[in-house]
Amino acid sequence: MSAPRPILRSSILAAGNGAPVLLLHGSASAAVMWVPAIDVLKAKFRVIAPDLVGYGRTDSWPDGCDFSVEDELRLLQPLLPREGPVHVVGHSYGGLVAMHFALAGRIALRSLTLIEPVAFFLLPHAGAHDAWMEIRALGDGYAAGIAAGETEAALRQFIDYWAGRGAWDAMDETLRAQIRRSARKIVLDFQVAFTDPGLEAVRALKCPVRVVSGGRSRAPTQHIASFLADALPSAEFEVVADANHLLPVTHPDMVAAMLLRELAE
């Protein structure tokens, strides 16, 4: 018999009416990241943006309790119509959770939009050995730093890797404090990203898929995006040439307009 799972209080942003759209944020972030997109999409859609486990106002995951992506999915499913269909959009770790949401097959999907998904388990399948070693070093080093109590150094390395050198030190202290509170959850996010559900399961995705990548992003996510675009026959692939991994943050108006255009098709 499996152990009972922790019961967490969750928080969401929701607005609008129409076909449901689920927006999933990345690690070290929160639903508020999607406010520019919500403001645009709410005119035509019912937009739901939850704080994922350990972020924003959703409870943290208890220390010492095993965690898997199923624990994220348990919080998401009650937010949506039982039968679907639903548009699902995810960025970074949220893109990974969105993939698993689609793989679980519990609710019909209208479409799946993956913006820089951190599906690191795909890198060996893609033959991207150097990118795999690079991201394993980041994830393992981050976990070791958190375990050793070196939270500030671990977060600086993590944020600077994705946002550019000096990004952590340049960040507003209020935002740094919010990220510090979620520092241990990022370790669990890496664990999910390294867990392989099987390439055949990914290839079996049947809903329309859009993959979006930043042309200035890191090699691991660029490899993942291009591999997904090739592995999924129905996938559409878009590269935003001047963007890095954080394109929903750095290019919010462009991302909002892109989603409105694509989800309305």
Predicted regions and their residues:
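Glycine-rich His-Gly loop
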Residues: 23-26, 92, 214
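Conserved acidic catalytic loop of the alpha/beta-hydrolase fold
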Residues: 70-86
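Catalytic histidine-centered segment of alpha/beta-hydrolase-like enzymes
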Residues: 240-256
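Conserved serine/cysteine hydrolase catalytic core
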Residues: 174-230, 236-239
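A catalytic-pocket lid/entrance helix-loop region that shapes and gates access to the active site
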Residues: 118-147
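Conserved hydrolase catalytic core segment
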Residues: 85-127
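Conserved alpha/beta-hydrolase catalytic His-Asp/Glu region
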Residues: 148-185
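Conserved HGGG/HGGXW glycine-rich cap/lid loop of the alpha/beta-hydrolase fold
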Residues: 8-65
